[in-house]
């Protein structure tokens, strides 16, 4: 894939083509980019169920045609029963099971908050039932099982088989579904119908919330009805980076948006435009190590921050980090944060309203726990907490966990506006940097910037080692050079899903919309 799709009225990019089409249908009916994104978010929760769902969290970056962007933090806090005492005797929080399902799922609150913003911006609204219609239909009538879903189910089967509700929900006759088969989710269809009829807020304050809380109590999850009722999506100020090419935005803590902006801020002080592949990878990897150090030292629940994250993006903060990079040698490297099953999606409508959105349940199938009679698999984002009371990420009721999720946007000096992002744990900020560097600084066409071979320092979806992973399509000379520089290189497949599913939309000054999707996904850039 080398050519982008270009349209005149609207564009939607998602890692599953059915979600792209759901968004496009809303745009064709006159809906806003925000409404289209809610439709896509609901659809992809059904058609890519191993990656995301109603039981996860979400983050939004909404860029109006003029003025400042609006961020939404729709992540949930630890439940009121999630105390250190509740995990006494354990070294770390389990990654699977009811004790891993310890944070409120916030993504539906983000849909609701985003629709309020849409009404404020446009003065009109499509019914929620219309926005959820495709998702309900796919859950009820069945989805085509992707190779990604089939592989995730089979590879994690022994780990997840005995988690409450998992086998009944995700297996067919006791086995992982086959790629290309039809897979139905009737309980989830019923839940979506309740949201369509009772409103999205019913997930937290209504009959659905009561059903969720009853299931949580029965399974021994540390979340209560009171925790659901107390949850609200928030609108934090986004982080900003003043780059030579324009203004870049990302999400504030508890996300690692700081990392994504710091990498680009550091490399903005290096010569990236003329760098060859080995130099590009080396410099971004070295910037990544320094940005990860900032992350690990500072990022936590925003109420517990010891610094102003925005101050870490000033020229005075970034220049010393850039100066410390040695073009002839790789610096030492510790370890990453681990995997993240996530979907990034983008939508831009005819008015120029642009949305960068990300939704996740953390690991594949999250905690593995499916709440009774709902079809909702609950996230395990709380596994990011520490059981060390002195740790920056120490578990406490009501505390937000660290998030790898971070949707990005940029308003460039030449008039272009870009929304972009990726799934993939530690890989998200690195993929953002690769895409931005190739497209904006090196003049590589948008689709080719995503399709070209990528790299990953650390761990991500399906990976456990902390090496520098390169796709096999990198030239042998590039791989050899990176090893000479001291990088511990591991070569993966030519197109590896470990590199995440990236996407981007660019609105050009003439109003044309250019969309690009990832050949590593099942996605599409759908426009009209």
Give the residues covered by each predicted segment:
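Active-site rim segments in enzyme catalytic domains, especially the processed small/beta chain
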Residues: 46-70, 222-225, 353-418, 442, ...
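Short beta-strand scaffold segments in enzyme catalytic cores
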Residues: 52-64, 343-348, 407-409, 499-507, ...
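Short, small/polar residue-rich loop motifs at catalytic or cofactor-binding pockets
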Residues: 235, 339-342, 403-405
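Internal maturation/activation junctions in enzymes
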Residues: 271-361, 373-374, 381
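Extended C-terminal subregions enriched in glycine
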Residues: 281, 304, 351, 399, ...
């Amino acid at each position: 894939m080398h050519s982008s799709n270009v349209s005149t009225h609207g564009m939607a990019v998602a890692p599953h083509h059915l979600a792209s089409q759901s968004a496009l249908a809303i745009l064709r009916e006159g809906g806003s980019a925000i409404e289209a994104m809610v439709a896509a978010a609901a659809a992809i929760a059904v058609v890519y169920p191993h990656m995301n769902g109603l039981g996860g969290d979400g983050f939004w970056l909404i860029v109006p045609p003029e003025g400042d962007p609006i961020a939404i933090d729709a992540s949930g806090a630890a439940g009121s029963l999630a105390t250190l005492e509740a995990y006494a005797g354990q070294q770390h929080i389990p990654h699977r099971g009811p004790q891993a399902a310890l944070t409120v799922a916030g993504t539906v609150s983000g849909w609701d908050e985003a629709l309020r913003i849409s009404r404020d911006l446009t003065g009109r609204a499509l019914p929620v039932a219309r926005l959820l219609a495709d998702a309900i239909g796919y859950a009820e009538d069945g989805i085509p099982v992707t190779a990604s879903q089939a592989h995730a189910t089979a590879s994690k089967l022994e780990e997840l088989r005995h988690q409450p509700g998992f086998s009944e929900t995700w297996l067919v006759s006791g086995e992982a579904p086959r790629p290309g088969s039809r897979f139905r989710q009737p309980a989830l269809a019923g839940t979506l119908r309740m949201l369509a009829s009772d409103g999205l807020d019913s997930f937290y304050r209504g009959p659905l919330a009561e059903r969720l809380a009853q299931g949580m109590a029965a399974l021994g999850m540390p979340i209560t009805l009171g925790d659901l009722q107390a949850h609200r999506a928030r609108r934090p100020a986004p982080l900003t980076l003043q780059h030579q090419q324009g203004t870049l935005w990302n999400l504030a803590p508890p996300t690692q948006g700081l990392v994504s902006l710091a990498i680009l801020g550091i490399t903005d002080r290096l010569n990236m435009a003329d760098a060859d592949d080995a130099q590009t990878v080396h410099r971004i990897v070295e910037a990544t190590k320094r940005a990860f150090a900032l992350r690990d030292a500072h990022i936590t629940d925003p109420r517990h921050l010891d610094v102003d994250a925005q101050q870490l993006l000033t020229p005075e903060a970034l220049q010393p980090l850039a100066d410390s990079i040695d073009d002839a040698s790789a610096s030492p490297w510790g370890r990453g944060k681990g995997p993240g099953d996530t979907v990034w999606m983008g939508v831009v409508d005819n008015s120029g309203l642009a949305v960068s959105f990300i939704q996740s349940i953390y690991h594949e199938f999250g905690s593995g726990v499916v709440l009774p009679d709902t079809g909702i698999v609950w996230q395990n984002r709380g596994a990011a907490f520490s059981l060390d009371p002195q740790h920056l990420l120490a578990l406490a009721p009501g505390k937000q966990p660290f998030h790898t999720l971070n949707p990005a946007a940029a308003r460039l000096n030449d008039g272009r506006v870009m929304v972009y992002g990726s799934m993939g744990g530690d890989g998200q900020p690195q993929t953002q940097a690769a895409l931005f560097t190739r497209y904006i600084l090196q003049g590589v066409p948008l689709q080719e910037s995503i399709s070209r071979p990528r790299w990953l320092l650390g761990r991500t979806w399906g990976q456990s080692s902390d090496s520098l992973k390169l796709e096999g399509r990198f030239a042998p000379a590039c791989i050899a050079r990176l090893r000479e520089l001291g990088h511990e290189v591991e070569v993966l497949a030519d197109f590896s899903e470990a590199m995440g599913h990236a996407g981007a939309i660019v609105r050009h000054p003439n109003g044309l919309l250019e969309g690009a999707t990832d050949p590593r996904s099942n996605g599409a850039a759908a426009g009209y």
